[in-house]
Every structure is written in C-alpha cells, then in structure tokens.
Amino acid sequence: MKKRSPKRSPKKTRKASKPASSLTSRHLALKRTVVRPSATKGELKYLHWGEVELETLNPLLQRQLIVGLNVMLTRVLLKKGCIVPLHSHVNEQLSYILEGALKFWIDGREIVVHAGEVLTIPPNMPHKAEALEDTIDLDIFNPPRADWINKTDSYLRK
C-alpha cells in the first residue's frame, strides 16, 4: 500500500518589493517658508527641503541651510554661468552634485564634478567654482560655516 504524503498548501510567493526610487527634483521641490533649522544639544530634527528657508544671494545663486551641532548641510542652487569666487575657509567641505555640473579651480587644477560625483575639499584650501549648467549641489561643512549662518559671506552676494 502506497503511503500518502501530507497535503501541503501551495507555496506563497512574496511580492517583490519595489526598488528605492532615485532622488529626483520632485523630491527636492521648493516651497517658500521662513524656517531656519538649527540644532541645539540633544534636539532631533526631521525636515523636508520645502520647510527650509530659501535664501537668494544673487540672481544666479540660492541656498538652504540645515545646521547641526558640528556639521552643516546646505542645498545650493546655481544657474548656468554662476561663478563662486575664489575663497577659502577653515571648514572641511564635501560637495555632492545632485543635478548639473560644477567646474572647480582648486590646488592648481581644474576639476569638473558631474551629477552623482563628490568632491572633498580640505580646510583652508582656496577654491573657485562655475556652474556649467543649472546645478543642484549638496555641500556638507564641518564645522558649520559661521559666515553663511550670520550672512557675512559678501563674496557670494555680488
């Protein structure tokens, strides 16, 4: 006599989860507000760029700042042809290009940084940049840039 195997329920198939979508300008949509987020000891912040003040420095340059205790994240919007004049600062800088491209003059070299690429700039290293096309740049500074926070960065406001 043949042994019967127990009835098994059909295998349940899991739905494949959707891959995380890439960051697009839709995610970075701007809304004008008056919030200037800054951290104080032990404060947790959860923000959308649309909640962060958009500051216009000149007709070709705008930025948003999120300031932490030891680091600052900035979203910089540059129109094609915008020049960031030669300058240096005591802050270490990481520049991540979300959209567009920036040409940097730094350490005796010209470096073009495209969307998806990162440039690290050590403290006190003079540098200049030009937007080769409309560009969205995320800059991280350690420590936070006091001249940007208190708006004494006249080299950008021309």
What spans do the regions from the language model cover?
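Ligand-binding loop in jelly-roll beta-barrel domains
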Residues: 123-147
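Structural motif
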Residues: 94, 101-103, 110, 126, ...
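Conserved short histidine dyad/triad with adjacent acidic residue
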Residues: 57-59, 74-88
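Short acidic-glycine-tyrosine-enriched beta hairpin
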Residues: 108-123
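A cytosolic small-molecule/anion-sensing beta-strand core signal
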Residues: 98-99, 114-115, 133
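Short, conserved beta-strand element in jelly-roll/cupin
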Residues: 77-79, 89-104
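A short, N-terminal "cap"/entry segment at the start of jelly-roll beta-barrel domains
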Residues: 1-70, 153-158
